[in-house]
Amino acid sequence: FLEILAAPRRPKLGFDSYAGWMAYAMKNDLLFVKKFKTYPDRVYNEVAGLTISVWYPEGARLELEPIGPRERLEPGEVGSFTEEWWLAPSRFPATGTNLDLERVTAIVESFESK
């Protein structure tokens, strides 16, 4: 797990992860989950071969960005990268307490069975 507690000084963070999901705990007691397929044996073209990024553009927003692997397409061919999005009720941690990462994992795993 990597838990980001506040917007970083530089707006974009990149990571190499094959977990296949990212989640964001929102202050309105919702958990936003993105699931996606990973390809450990394929090349990723992000600057450092990263598979996910978290971006904090200006203003009150955040982007969770899974990155697909490189595709070489011939004229007329089509490529795609699918993300599944879910919202789940999940109490935002009170000031001075930690996010319950086991509960987050259980929520994500519950989507896998659907």
Descriptions of predicted regions:
Residues 1-78, 90, 95-102:
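A contiguous, surface-exposed recognition patch within enzymatic or periplasmic domains that forms
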Residues 84-86:
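Short, surface-exposed secondary-structure boundary micro-motifs
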Residues 99-114:
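Short peripheral tails and domain-boundary helices/loops at the edges of structured domains
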